[in-house]
């Protein structure tokens, strides 16, 4: 018996309505369904509630209704287990989702029949090291961001690849993005768009103090480290928009490829550059 997990953005009425329809369709097909506890409450099905944990790693597919933010958070839960994720857009941009909510039921039937592709997307991990000790490791699909607090002035950051210092930034912060994240915050900060199949990481300063500061593209498997050289105030590390982990002067953030990937469900005919044109230019 196939088993699916369903996550919805409960704040979006369209996600709730479409979620109810998809749940009915899945159960009618004979599949077992797990619901995130919040979704179970919103859909009135507490009998299907399953807290995040090992059970989520045993499903055949995770179906997500919401925008890119909802999908990214869901990916973080199941990527270590290799679970495919199907995103259905009920938000605004929906750059990472596979289909729009209005097409969901018809397209879902194709997916349930096995007519889909799996796209592997690189993820990264950022580890905070203080006095030689690893304090925290944060996974991300889009990016890891070191940034100053709301009342702090510029932070001084030193970027190294291996034993070589490649950049020193006086800026509001720095973004380390995957190719997937190249169309997110990094793009807004002036970074390039990178095709998802390229094996690399992008280092982009945020509002640097000098015009000569530019993005750097490095290999995905290099030893990339960012040291907080000095900070006159608060500075923190966030991953995919998470709450920041506080950093101190002298802390080092080591960023590299995660030992797992995000597995995104795609419909036949998916092309990255078609999506890029449609989502970013509206044509």
From Swiss-Prot:
Source domain of life: Bacteria
Protein's GO biological process: NAD metabolic process; NADP biosynthetic process
Catalytic activities: NAD(+) + ATP = ADP + NADP(+) + H(+)
EC number annotated for this UniProt entry: 2.7.1.23
Cellular localization per UniProt: Cytoplasm
Binding site for NAD(+): 68-69, 73, 142-143, 153, 170, 172, 183-188
Cofactor entry: a divalent metal cation
Gene Ontology cellular component list: cytoplasm
InterPro entries xref list: ATP-NAD_kinase_N, ATP-NAD_kinase_PpnK-typ_C, NAD/diacylglycerol_kinase_sf, NADK
One Gene Ontology term of the molecular function aspect: NAD binding
Disulfide bonds: none
Keyword terms: ATP-binding, Cytoplasm, Kinase, NAD, NADP, Nucleotide-binding, Transferase
Any Pfam family: NAD_kinase_C
Residue numbers annotated as active site: 68 (proton acceptor)
Family under the similarity heading: Belongs to the NAD kinase family.
Entry function: Involved in the regulation of the intracellular balance of NAD and NADP, and is a key enzyme in the biosynthesis of NADP. Catalyzes specifically the phosphorylation on 2'-hydroxyl of the adenosine moiety of NAD to yield NADP.
Name of the molecule in the record: NAD kinase
Provenance organism: Symbiobacterium thermophilum (strain DSM 24528 / JCM 14929 / IAM 14863 / T)
Source species taxonomy: Bacteria, Bacillati, Bacillota, Clostridia, Eubacteriales
Gene designation per UniProt: nadK
């Amino acid at each position: 018996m196939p088993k699916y997990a369903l996550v919805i953005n409960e704040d979006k009425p369209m996600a709730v309505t479409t979620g109810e329809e998809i749940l009915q369709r899945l159960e009618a097909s004979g599949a077992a369904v797990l619901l995130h506890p919040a979704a179970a409450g919103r859909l009135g099905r507490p009998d299907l509630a399953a807290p995040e944990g090992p059970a989520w790693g045993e499903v055949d597919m995770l179906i997500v209704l919401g925008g890119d933010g909802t999908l990214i958070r869901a990916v973080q839960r199941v990527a270590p287990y290799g679970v495919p994720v199907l995103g259905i857009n009920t938000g605004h941009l929906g750059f990472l989702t596979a289909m729009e909510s209005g097409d969901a039921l018809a397209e879902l039937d194709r997916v349930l029949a096995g007519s889909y592709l799996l796209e592997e997307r690189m993820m990264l991990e950022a580890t905070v090291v203080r006095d030689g000790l690893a304090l925290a490791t944060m996974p991300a699909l889009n990016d890891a961001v070191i940034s100053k607090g709301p009342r702090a002035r510029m932070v001084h950051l030193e970027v190294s690849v291996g034993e070589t210092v490649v950049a020193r930034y006086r800026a509001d912060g720095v973004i380390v993005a995957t190719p997937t994240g190249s169309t997110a915050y990094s793009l807004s900060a002036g970074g390039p768009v990178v095709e998802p199949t390229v094996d690399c990481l992008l280092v982009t300063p945020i509002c640097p103090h000098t015009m000569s500061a530019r993005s750097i593209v490095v290999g995905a498997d290099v030893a990339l480290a960012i040291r907080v050289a000095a900070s006159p105030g608060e500075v923190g590390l966030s991953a995919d928009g998470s709450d920041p982990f506080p950093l101190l002067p002298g802390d080092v953030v080591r960023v590299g490829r995660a030992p797992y990937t995000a597995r995104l469900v795609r419909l036949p005919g998916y092309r990255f550059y078609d999506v890029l044109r449609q989502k970013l230019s509206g044509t």
